[in-house]
C-alpha cells in the first residue's frame, strides 16, 4: 500500500497513524511525499509492472479531474478507482451524453472505462462542515485499457490524443454544432464517413462516436497526403 501525500506534516504523521490503528499493515505501507500530478512509473517503480492496482483517494476537489485523467494516462495498469470528490464533480465524471453537465471530463474518462456515482456523503460527517456535498465515484477500466471501439480491424488503435483533441474542440464551443466547432480541423466528408450528423452538438456524442469521427478524420487526412 502506497500513500501519496503532498502536505509534509501529514505525510510525516501517516506511518505513526498506520502503526497505531493498523499495526499489521506497517510492513507493507509506505508514504510518498509529493504532488499526485507529478507521479509516474519512474518515480513510483512499485507500480511499473503489469499487475493491476486500485486507487482509493479523497481527492482535493479543485484538481480531482486532472489527477484522475493524468494517472490513467501514465499508468496503464490502474484498473479501478474509488474516490471521494465534490458531488458536482462526481456527477460530471459519471454523466451520460445529452445532459448539461456532460462534458470533457465525462467523455475523456469514458475512453478508459466506466464510471458511476456509488454514494453521496453529507457535509455533516466532516468537521468543520464544508459548504459542499461529497460523493463517491467507482471507475473500472476496460480490459484493453481503452474503449473497444478504438480497436481497428488491422490490430492498431485509434490515437487517443487525436480523439481528445476533437473532444476539446467540440466542448470548447459547446453551444455550437459540430460542423461549426470543428470546421477548422475536420472536413465534412469525415462526418459522412463516420455516420455522424454535423448539425449535432458535441454534448450529444458518446466516446465511441468521437472515436468513429477521429478514425474517419485520420483516414481523410491520409488520403489527402497520398
Task: Annotate each predicted stretch with a short phrase.
Residues 196-226:
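Short, amphipathic C-terminal "tail helix"
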Residues 135, 139-141, 148-189, 197, ...:
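An accessory alpha-helical subdomain
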Residues 192:
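Short acidic (Asp/Glu) and glycine-rich catalytic loops that position anionic groups and cofactors
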Residues 1-161, 165-166, 212-215, 223-226:
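Catalytic cores of RNA-modifying enzymes
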Amino acid at each position: 500500500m502506497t500513500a501519496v501525500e503532498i502536505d509534509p506534516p501529514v505525510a510525516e504523521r501517516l506511518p505513526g497513524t498506520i502503526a497505531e490503528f493498523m499495526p499489521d499493515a506497517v510492513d507493507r505501507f509506505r508514504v510518498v511525499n509529493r504532488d499526485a500530478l507529478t507521479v509516474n512509473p519512474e518515480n513510483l517503480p512499485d507500480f511499473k509492472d503489469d499487475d493491476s492496482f486500485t486507487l482509493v483517494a479523497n481527492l482535493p476537489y479543485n484538481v480531482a479531474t486532472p489527477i484522475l485523467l493524468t494517472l490513467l494516462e501514465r499508468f496503464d495498469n490502474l484498473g479501478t478507482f474509488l474516490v471521494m470528490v465534490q458531488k458536482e464533480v462526481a456527477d460530471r465524471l459519471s454523466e451520460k451524453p445529452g445532459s448539461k453537465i456532460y462534458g470533457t471530463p465525462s467523455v475523456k474518462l469514458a475512453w478508459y472505462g466506466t464510471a458511476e456515482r456509488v454514494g453521496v456523503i453529507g457535509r455533516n460527517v466532516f468537521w468543520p462542515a464544508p459548504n459542499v456535498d461529497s460523493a463517491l465515484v467507482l471507475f473500472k477500466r476496460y480490459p484493453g485499457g481503452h474503449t473497444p471501439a478504438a480497436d481497428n480491424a488491422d490490430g492498431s488503435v485509434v490515437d487517443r490524443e487525436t480523439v481528445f483533441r476533437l473532444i476539446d474542440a467540440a466542448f470548447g464551443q459547446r453551444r455550437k454544432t459540430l460542423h461549426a466547432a470543428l470546421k477548422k480541423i475536420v472536413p465534412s466528408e469525415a462526418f459522412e464517413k463516420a455516420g455522424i450528423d454535423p448539425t449535432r452538438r458535441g454534448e450529444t456524442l458518446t466516446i465511441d462516436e468521437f472515436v468513429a469521427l477521429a478514425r474517419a478524420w485520420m483516414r481523410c487526412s491520409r488520403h489527402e497526403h497520398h
